[in-house]
Amino acid sequence: MAFFLLLIVSLLTCIGQVCQKQAVVSWQNNSTTKARKTIFWLITAIAMLGFGMLFWLRLLQILPLSIAYPMLSINFIVVTLIGQFIYKETVNVKHWVGIASIMLGIVLMSMQS
């Protein structure tokens, strides 16, 4: 149950972040529907982050904060991949070393002691 909730929280918060990025992209566009598109993406971002918070509150009833919060570091990995492959952002070697360090930390924290 905890893993499922963590997955939902992570997905919703990542989607919320991507919607915020899309709002910025829409705002920079010079189309006549710029404001409407931007508002759509901002409202969608707020909704995704709000639903993510509700699932997060449920997750905190199951897992200690000291375990649950670091597990959300997976979001750094997901958002970096989305930035690179969807928005064609450049990710340098230092960034990938940081991502690998985060992944190692997640693995270490998820291991039973």
Swiss-Prot record:
InterPro entries: EamA_dom, Flippase_ArnE, Small_drug/metabolite_transptr
Pathway involvement of the protein, from the record: Bacterial outer membrane biogenesis; lipopolysaccharide biosynthesis
Signal sequence, renumbered to the chain: none
Record GO terms (molecular function): carbohydrate derivative transmembrane transporter activity
Membrane topology, as annotated: Multi-pass membrane protein
GO CC entries: plasma membrane
Keywords per UniProt: Cell inner membrane, Cell membrane, Lipid A biosynthesis, Lipid biosynthesis, Lipid metabolism, Lipopolysaccharide biosynthesis, Membrane, Transmembrane, Transmembrane helix, Transport
Major subcellular location class: membrane
Alphabetical list of Pfam families matching this protein: EamA (PF00892)
GO biological process: lipid A biosynthetic process; lipopolysaccharide biosynthetic process
Domain called EamA: residue spans: 42-111
Entry annotated with the keyword Membrane: yes
Top-rank taxon, per record: Bacteria
Transmembrane domains' residue ranges: 39-59, 62-82, 91-111
Cell compartment(s), UniProt: Cell inner membrane
Function: Translocates 4-amino-4-deoxy-L-arabinose-phosphoundecaprenol (alpha-L-Ara4N-phosphoundecaprenol) from the cytoplasmic to the periplasmic side of the inner membrane.
Subunit structure: Heterodimer of ArnE and ArnF.
Family the UniProt entry places it in: Belongs to the ArnE family.
The protein, known as: Probable 4-amino-4-deoxy-L-arabinose-phosphoundecaprenol flippase subunit ArnE
